[in-house]
């Protein structure tokens, strides 16, 4: 069988290296090198998977977890780790079960996959743009910038539309549509959130907060919450908690939605009030602006002082109980109105893509067109941050590779 795989990213490279040698595999990549998006994954360290059991893994898939069940059980994170290690890549498991190459270099992951596909006899065609895919009878014609390729099967592994500079420009959606596949509108997922009060976030830009509780309040009701780390940006908020939250709110109307940060989640209102009171006793002769240094990061103090409504030069010993309670409320509810999610180009992954109702979950073959497959981010599946999205790419690639090897 002659097989063309379109896209030399994570799923395309792994599928190429896994399809049995009885087939002729041609991997077509529009960039000058393979794995361009992999290269920047995990800030250049490449979080290859999450070392957890399939059941726990599926709890971290935000969109279409049920569809992924067969593939995740069929090729687990343990299998990914074994494959990479057998091919010479040493791995290390870090906090939150996140798995990285020991070298901390994403380039080593790309090298490992490149070696595996060369060992498998795959023909790689770089700098080759696929313009269209058509089918006549049982034969596919893949029209490229370097001429047509005829083949028996096509695997679309073109990714989503996030980080377009890496080549993810939504080409796969075009190919899917040409075969009458439905595309679920692509949206940003795992992305920063932009807020209305950018005058405040600009002042706090670069400030990272650890161990905070971040909630999303919509029409007065809490709809999602995350505990952990976050960072302020010129336009709003980002960091691990925010990225996870973005995956949960990218399908809702963001009018009347706010981000609420509990700066002291370990303390109840009463406990925090006692803590503030004891600090005020300790600094009783100081001005208010100089009395919060034990409680808050230096960069945050001027903002909290201003928003508290207490004059900065007020002596601490004359601050009323009511003003103190307002301050405690602010520390437990440091709120920002949501303006929008960051544009899809800035998102870590794309939510949306080829509708899973039209794909066989066991093989990732199109239910509409025989021998046409869709794997990786081009499919409407996405997960939280922590190596889950790459595992989706690996598992879907292997499901297709096994089907094509039969």
Please place each PLM-identified region on the residue numbering.
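A glycine-rich dinucleotide-binding beta-alpha-beta segment and adjacent secondary-structure elements
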Residues: 126, 132, 302-382
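Glycine-rich loop(s) and the adjacent beta-strand/alpha-helix scaffold that form part
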Residues: 153-199
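An anion/pyrophosphate-binding glycine-rich loop and adjacent beta-alpha core
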Residues: 32-34, 40, 54-55, 182-185, ...
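Short hydrophobic core segments
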Residues: 4-6, 28, 130, 149-165, ...
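Conserved beta-strand-loop-beta-strand element in the redox core of flavoprotein oxidoreductases
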Residues: 132-149, 154, 219
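N-terminal Rossmann-like FAD-binding beta1-loop-alpha1 element of flavoenzymes
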Residues: 2-27, 400-405
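Conserved N-terminal/central alpha/beta ligand/cofactor-binding core
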Residues: 30-123
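A conserved FAD-binding loop/helix module that cradles the flavin
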Residues: 162-175, 179, 381-406
């Amino acid at each position: 069988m002659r097989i063309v795989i379109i896209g030399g990213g994570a799923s395309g490279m792994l599928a190429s290296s896994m399809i049995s040698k009885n087939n002729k595999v041609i991997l077509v990549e529009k960039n000058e090198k393979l794995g361009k998006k992999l290269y920047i994954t995990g800030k250049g360290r490449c979080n290859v998977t999450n070392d957890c059991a399939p059941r726990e893994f599926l709890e971290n898939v935000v969109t279409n977890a049920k569809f992924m069940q067969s593939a995740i059980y069929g090729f687990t994170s343990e299998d990914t780790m074994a494959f990479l290690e057998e091919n010479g890549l040493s791995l290390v498991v870090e906090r939150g079960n996140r798995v990285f190459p020991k070298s901390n270099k994403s380039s080593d992951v790309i090298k490992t996959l490149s070696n595996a596909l060369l060992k498998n006899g795959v023909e790689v065609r770089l700098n080759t743009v696929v313009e269209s895919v058509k089918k006549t009878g049982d034969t596919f014609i893949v029209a490229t910038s370097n001429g047509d390729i005829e083949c028996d099967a096509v695997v679309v592994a073109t990714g989503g539309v996030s980080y377009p500079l890496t080549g993810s420009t939504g080409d796969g959606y075009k190919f899917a549509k040409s075969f009458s596949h439905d595309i679920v509108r692509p949206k940003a997922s795992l992305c920063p959130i932009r807020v209305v009060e950018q005058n405040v976030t600009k002042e706090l830009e670069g400030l990272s907060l650890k161990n905070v509780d971040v909630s999303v309040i919509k029409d007065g009701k809490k709809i999602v919450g995350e505990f952990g780390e976050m960072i302020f940006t010129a336009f709003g908020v980002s960091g691990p908690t925010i990225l996870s939250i973005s995956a949960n709110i990218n399908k809702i109307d963001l009018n009347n939605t706010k981000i609420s940060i509990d700066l002291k989640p370990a303390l109840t209102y009463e406990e925090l009030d006692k803590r503030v009171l004891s600090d005020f006793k300790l600094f009783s002769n100081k001005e208010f602006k100089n009395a919060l240094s034990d409680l808050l990061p230096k960069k945050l103090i001027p903002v909290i002082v201003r928003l508290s409504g207490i004059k900065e030069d007020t002596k601490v010993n004359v601050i009323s109980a009511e003003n103190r309670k307002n301050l405690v409320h602010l520390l437990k509810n440091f709120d920002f109105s949501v303006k929008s999610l960051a544009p899809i180009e800035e998102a870590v992954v794309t939510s949306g893509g080829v509708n899973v109702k039209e794909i066989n979950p066991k093989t990732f073959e199109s239910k509409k067109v025989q021998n046409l497959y869709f794997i990786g981010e081009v499919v409407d599946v996405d997960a939280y941050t922590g190596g889950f999205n790459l595992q989706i790419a690996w598992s879907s690639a292997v499901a297709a590779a096994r089907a094509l090897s039969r």
